[in-house]
């Protein structure tokens, strides 16, 4: 009886059809439920038995048997069989798998049942049959060396996804989705956090995670020869092309070229040809023949603009030589090329190129030359930091930020590096809680780095800026830093004095009052002849000195800094009168006195702990400052 049931399942498959049960917006991002059936593998005894049974059933477009009662019974039976097979994937306690597959994004291997995969896919049938006959496990027509992944204890085979799907990347979620279809005959809707990005302003119908998920599914469906899914995913990809940014069209074009999807490929080529995507990106991201085709279309459709773009072949040649030197990780050669020609790093957009295509070491060495404008925008309105955010490489983002890249710079369409990174990050990766000692997700790490920088530098203020709004922001930042340093001098005078000496904060005038050396207590006189640019430089120099003071305090006196953080965030009152212990009702005065005693004890403990932990810090301060080290009064 079980054998007959298996034959009936295969016989019913050709008469099944695709059913969509949701709106088109859900369909576009791959999250709509649909049911698709697979044609028989066409190899082995199972396929030989399927043909006569299918003929006996009639094989028509709608039915699977004789009467209506028989049809309904078969539908119920098939749904029950589908649910039972799905348990093999979902129920961790029911582990009767006999092979494993390592996926591209790491983590534990995915267990599979070779008998089910072989019955449902000619790819897996050929792969496992070749291994059973003593072969290397390579499936004919592009299966890869699946058997080369090694053996577990007990002879359990292990396959690598990059060998099963050569030329394409398939992540865990996309592979599990395809497995679910092979096991159950139904393509379940994609989880929302897999096809949605971490940008709260995104509608999530065509954001990069949804595109990547469908691209990965297409790679897998093409490699596993699941023809009906190829047709479904092709329609989804066609829907994405005109709705998303041109950068997100590139992976669609790549999978269309790899999987020979002519309609998708032609539509992607037309979209990119109409865009302002530069030739460097075309040459680096696309197959050579496709890049040439796009350039030819541009020259034919816009001949006049084509002549102006390639106006200086010598200049273009010099730019390509610098880019090739960067590809070779040879920054010394870049310096030689700059010396022997009149071209600059900015002319060649060398920093943009390195941020997009080179490793962090090359970017760091290029920044050390101090010959490139960190915030220069290329022809498409992107800075090097924007390109590093698109690449989602934490080391490169940190290199640029440490050298002074402006985190608040916007692209032509109003995107910041933070919003770019959020748009490229899956909600699943953003919300994943990392255990201690576990490697952090790179996408989430990039967002955290940019987020901290946005908090530290909420707005880049140029020397020439005279906008009242920007000036107010600078004043607010100065007031916060002045208050923080003032409370540090009140609570921790010795530590504050050392930190201010090393940061040279005592050489810049305080904001709004006379320097501490003066005892008049009067407000600082306003220089009416001071230009806005001069005033801005003076205020920024004070901000830099105070910022360095705070950073030194966090580095060498962390416990004192924690007390200051808590006081400024939780205990600092809105009104100065609230600090007076004599004001307020008797209950309020008691609360103030209790909190004052608690704060006093926190200050004493932090002072003692930092003093014990940093007993050698006075040596550092004496070597970092021209003035003699301060003498700390003994208690």
UniProtKB/Swiss-Prot annotation:
ANK repeat residue numbers: 317-347, 349-376, 380-409
UniProt keywords, alphabetically: ANK repeat, Metal-binding, Nucleus, Plant defense, Repeat, Ubl conjugation pathway, Zinc, Zinc-finger
One GO MF term: zinc ion binding
Cell compartments where the protein resides: Nucleus
Record keyword Zinc present: yes
Disordered: annotated segments: 138-157
One annotated Gene Ontology cellular component of this protein: nucleus
Biological process terms in GO annotation: defense response to bacterium; defense response to fungus; regulation of jasmonic acid mediated signaling pathway; regulation of salicylic acid mediated signaling pathway; systemic acquired resistance, salicylic acid mediated signaling pathway
Pathway connected to this protein: Protein modification; protein ubiquitination
UniProt key word RNA-binding: no
SMART domains xref list: ANK, BTB
SUPFAM superfamilies referenced in this protein's UniProt entry, alphabetically: Ankyrin repeat (SSF48403), POZ domain (SSF54695)
Bias type Gly residues, positions: 138-152
Residue ranges occupied by any BTB domain in the UniProt entry: 97-191
First-listed, main subcellular location of the protein, grouped into a coarse class: nucleus
Complex and partners: Interacts with NRR. Interacts with TGAL1 and TGAL11.
Family statement drawn from the similarity comment of this UniProt entry: Belongs to the plant 'ANKYRIN-BTB/POZ' family. 'NPR1-like' subfamily.
Name of the protein in its database record: BTB/POZ domain and ankyrin repeat-containing protein NPR2
Lineage: Eukaryota, Viridiplantae, Streptophyta, Embryophyta, Tracheophyta
């Amino acid at each position: 009886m079980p054998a007959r049931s298996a034959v009936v399942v295969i016989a019913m498959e050709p008469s099944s059809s695709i059913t969509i049960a949701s709106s088109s917006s859900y369909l576009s991002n791959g999250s709509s439920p649909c049911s698709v059936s697979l044609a028989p593998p066409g190899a082995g005894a199972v396929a030989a038995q399927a043909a006569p049974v299918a003929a006996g059933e009639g094989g028509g477009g709608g039915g699977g048997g004789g009467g209506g009662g028989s049809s309904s019974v078969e539908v119920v039976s098939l749904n029950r069989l589908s649910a039972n097979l799905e348990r093999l994937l979902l129920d961790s306690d029911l582990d009767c798998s006999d092979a494993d597959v390592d996926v591209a994004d790491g983590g534990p291997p995915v267990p599979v049942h070779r008998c089910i995969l072989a019955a449902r896919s000619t790819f897996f049938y050929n792969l496992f049959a070749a291994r059973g006959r003593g072969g290397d496990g390579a499936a004919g027509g592009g299966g890869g060396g699946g058997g080369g992944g090694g053996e577990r204890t007990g002879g359990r085979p292990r396959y690598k996804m990059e060998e099963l799907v050569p030329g394409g990347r398939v992540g865990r979620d996309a592979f599990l989705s395809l497995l679910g279809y092979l096991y159950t005959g139904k393509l379940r809707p994609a989880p929302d956090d897999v096809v949605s990005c971490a940008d709260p302003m995104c509608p999530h119908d065509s954001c990069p995670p949804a595109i990547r998920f469908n691209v990965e599914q297409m790679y897998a469906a093409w490699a596993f020869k699941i023809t009906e899914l190829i047709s479904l995913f092709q329609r989804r990809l066609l829907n994405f092309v005109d709705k998303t940014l041109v950068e997100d069209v590139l992976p669609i074009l790549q999978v269309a070229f790899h999987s020979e999807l002519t309609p998708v490929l032609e539509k992607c080529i037309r979209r990119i040809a109409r865009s302002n995507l530069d030739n460097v990106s075309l040459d680096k991201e696309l197959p050579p023949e496709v890049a040439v085709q796009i350039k030819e279309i541009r020259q034919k459709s816009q001949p006049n603009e084509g002549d102006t773009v390639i106006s200086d072949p010598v200049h273009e040649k010099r730019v390509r030589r610098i880019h090739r030197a960067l590809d070779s990780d040879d920054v010394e050669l870049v310096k030689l090329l700059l010396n022997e020609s009149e071209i600059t790093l900015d002319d060649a957009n060398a920093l943009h190129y390195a941020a997009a295509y080179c490793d962090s070491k090359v970017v760091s060495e290029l920044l050390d030359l101090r010959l490139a404008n960190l915030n220069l925008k290329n022809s498409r309105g992107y800075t090097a930091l924007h390109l590093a955010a698109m690449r989602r490489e934490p080391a490169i983002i940190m290199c640029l930020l440490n050298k002074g890249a402006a985190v608040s710079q916007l692209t032509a369409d109003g995107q910041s590096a933070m919003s770019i990174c959020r748009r490229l990050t899956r909600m699943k990766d953003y919300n994943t809680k990392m255990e201690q000692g576990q490697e952090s997700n790179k996408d989430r790490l990039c967002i955290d780095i940019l987020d901290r920088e946005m908090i530290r530098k909420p707005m880049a203020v140029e020397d020439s800026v005279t906008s009242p709004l920007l000036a107010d922001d600078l004043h607010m930042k100065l007031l916060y830093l002045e208050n923080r340093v003032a409370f540090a001098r009140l609570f921790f005078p010795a530590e504050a004095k050392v930190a201010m000496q090393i940061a040279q904060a005592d050489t810049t005038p305080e904001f709004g009052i006379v320097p501490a050396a003066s005892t008049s207590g009067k407000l600082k006189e306003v220089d009416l002849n001071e230009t806005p640019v001069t005033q801005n430089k003076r205020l920024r120099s004070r901000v830099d000195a105070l910022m360095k003071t705070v950073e030194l305090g966090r580095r060498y006196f962390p416990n004192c800094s924690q007390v200051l953080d808590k006081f400024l965030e939780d205990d600092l009152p809105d009104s100065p009168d609230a600090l007076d212990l004599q004001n307020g009702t008797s209950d309020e005065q008691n609360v103030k006195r209790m909190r004052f005693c608690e704060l006093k004890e926190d200050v004493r403990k932090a002072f003692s702990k930092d003093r014990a932990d940093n007993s050698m810090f006075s040596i550092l301060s004496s070597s970092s400052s021209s003035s003699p080290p301060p003498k700390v009064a003994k208690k």
